[in-house]
Amino acid sequence: MHFKSGFVTIIGRPNVGKSTLLNGIIGEKIAIMSSKPQTTRHKITGVFNDENSQIIFVDTPGIHKPKNKLGDYMVNSAKSAVDDVDVVILMVDHSTKIGPGDEYLLEFIKAAKVDVILVINKVDLISPDEFKGIYDYYSNLDFIKKIVGLSAINGKGITDLVETIKSELPEGPAFYPTDHMTDQTERTIVSEIVREKVLMYIDEEIPHGVAVEVQSMKTRKNKDNIEIYDIEVDIICEKQSHKGIIIGKEGRKLKGIGKSARQDVEKLLQTKVNLQLFVKVREGWRDNDNFLRGLGYKE
């Protein structure tokens, strides 16, 4: 079999399971996951390798109606991700009825003129009749080339999806070394891990007004000559009242966030970690161009 390689964008509405799917395909946690919509803010590249292919995946923020400059960035980022790719994965689930948001997304993808594989997620939670209804609706769209059902959270159907993607890719060499898994730096992954834990521990709308910025990452040896990573991270919120909620009574919320994040960061870095979290208030940061650029958001 000839070697195949290519670029694939995963796109869909917020909270349909795009990051869960990406992590499942790559086999490592490179995108944070949460039940809250709009968890992913940046495009994330993940690289799948096997003996006869290399697939470069781009996970995107969910397409939604933006309410601020951060939202504008996220939606523009998702839209630009379909440029110059070989295949688009359009991911949907059964939990919401097809509405104006879906129709808008379909019109956008149709205009992109690229091969589209529809992925119906959470098939383990729907009946055969429900699956057929979704399948029939999308199979009538001429730009949908193939349809795959799967459950991203338990891995069912992921292998079939990968084989389907391979069938649509051109022959060509690998773009990255075989041990390359993501384009994210350790610093970026650490900040995303902390943000994931904020999403996990904090309810209501507060998480959407939270940014995370790694201020420093330094290694040192302790008295037993064991390497330790000292990491300082700012959790930035928009209101003083939000700061108190994130910290929690007697600091319990922040301690929980820190403990859970530290465990994941230690797995990532394969070393002991001293993680210090600081909660800071910056009003209106989601509409501040300079601040957004400092966090890595670009037009």
What are the residue ranges of the model-derived segments?
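Conserved C-terminal guanine-recognition region of P-loop GTPase G domains, centered on the G4
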Residues: 49-54, 76-147, 221-224
